[in-house]
Every structure is written in structure tokens, then in C-alpha cells.
Amino acid sequence: MKKFWKTVCAVALVGMVVLPVQAEEKTITVGTMSWEDLTPITGITKKVLENAGYTVKVVEFSEIGIAYAALTKGDVQVLASQTDYATQDYWNKNKNRLEKLSPVSYGLYQAIAVPKYVDIDSLDQLNDNADKFSGKIIGIEPGSGLMSDANKAVKDYGFKLQLLEGSTAAMTAALKSAVDRKEWVAVTIWEPSWMAQKFDLKFLKDPKGSFAPPQAYYWIGHKGFSAEYPHAREVMASVYVPLADITAINGAVKDGKTMDQAVAGWADNHADLMKRWANIKQ
């Protein structure tokens, strides 16, 4: 009997096939928006992944809806986004096909701001000073999360001022023109932004809570990314870029550097940190 079972076991062992563990892919396609708060995050994370042995391709989008569509289809594999408020609608619509990987920064705030020489401090003071603002609030691109909140504020506060839709470039030009003349101006703006520092702005208090509170930035991926790229996910989860550093990188860009040069300068100044991030163990 013992010989019989030994024979059976031997045959079974011969018939077993040991399947090799599938190696993790080393090429990752990263999506990014051409926004000043997201491009530094993307650039730094790209460098860390490259230092960890990955080949990283970056695809830039001009519309957040297109970026989310590309992520759900797998045209890009990861994307940095503010899923709690700024892009919440897109996240909620697609979250069954996506996964949240890790937080990468915190503190985004979007609201209405004025130069510090303007002697009001709250949104509920705008109506009493509408004439000083020429009856308008200078907005940015329609359809953005910031403009959605700004339209909510118009209703919540019953603003007599008109919220003007336009572009970030047009808003910046109007802001610069007003500040150069020390005129009163109200704009929709965000932090981190070089503009908040350059033009010495202050956010107006929002007692009715029309605007979202400070928001986190997350790396999000298509469904299954963590399983397909377990080590890359761990590397990305180690990366955290403080808001002040994002602002500093954009300040360097405003002073004439390219984004790649500004990110490279930041990386050189944080070489030990970059090395620790890249060498994170799975």
C-alpha cells in the first residue's frame, strides 16, 4: 500500500506545472491636466517612478472630462485629481471603474478673492460695494468646479454683481490691470497659485459655506491598477508634495523656467527624499 501511494504522489508531482509569477509591467502612462497645481505633482511623481525603474509616459489633457474618460478606458493608467469636491461629479460618475490610490497633497482652496488693499473681508460685503467693483466678479472657464461654486455663491448671497465667464488668461489680465491702478477687483481664484502671491490677494470669508473647504489631491487609477502594478502603487503612495512646494515650483516657472526645469530643481534640492521614495519596499 505504501508503495502504491508513493507511486501516486510521484505521478502527481510529475504532472504538476509550476506557473511563474507574472512580472510587473515597467511602463506606465500618466494623465495630467495642464493646471498649475497638478503639473508639479505629476512631474515629481514621474521622476520618482523613473528613479524606481519605470518608463513613464505623460499625456496632457485640456478638459477634465476627457481625462476621466481616458482613465476609465485605460488610455492612461493613473491621474492626479481632487476627487472630494473639484472633480467630484466625474469621480462619482466613474468610480466603479476606477480606484483611489493615495493622497499626494492637501490644501487646494478655490473661492473669490480681492487685493489686500480692498477694505472688505467677507462675501456678504460685496453687494454694499458693488459699484466699486464695477458691478462684476471676474470668473474663469465655464464648467470648472470653481465656477460652479461661484454660481452657487451668487445665489446664496443674492449678489447684485455679475459673475463673468471667460478664461484664466483673461482673468489674470484683468486682475493685473486693476492692481496696477489700485482699483477694486474681485476674481475667482485658487490656492496654490502664483497669482495669489504675485498680486497680494486675500480670500473673502464665506459665512454661508458656498465654496468647498480645503481639498486633498489623490492619485487615482483605472480599476485593477494596484493589482497590476503593486510596487508602482507603493512608490506612488510614498510621494507627498506640500502645497508650499507646488507654489514655489510655479513661481520658478513664472520667473522663466520651464516646468521640467523647475521640477528638476526641486528634485535636486530634495535628493535624499526622492531617493527614499524611489527605494520604497513593496
Where are the model-predicted features located?
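Ligand-binding cleft/hinge of the Venus flytrap
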Residues: 45-53, 130-163, 268
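Ligand-binding pocket segment of bilobal, Venus flytrap-like solute-binding proteins
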Residues: 70, 76-80, 142-209
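Bacterial N-terminal signal peptides that target proteins for export
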Residues: 1-9
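A conserved helix-loop-strand patch within extracytoplasmic ligand-binding domains
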Residues: 96-146
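Extracytoplasmic "Venus flytrap"
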Residues: 27-43, 62-64
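Sec/Tat signal peptide C-region and signal peptidase I cleavage site
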Residues: 18-23
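A bilobed periplasmic-binding-protein/Venus flytrap-type ligand-binding module shared by bacterial periplasmic
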Residues: 109-119, 215-228
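Pocket-flanking alpha-helical
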Residues: 42, 59-97, 173-174, 194-200
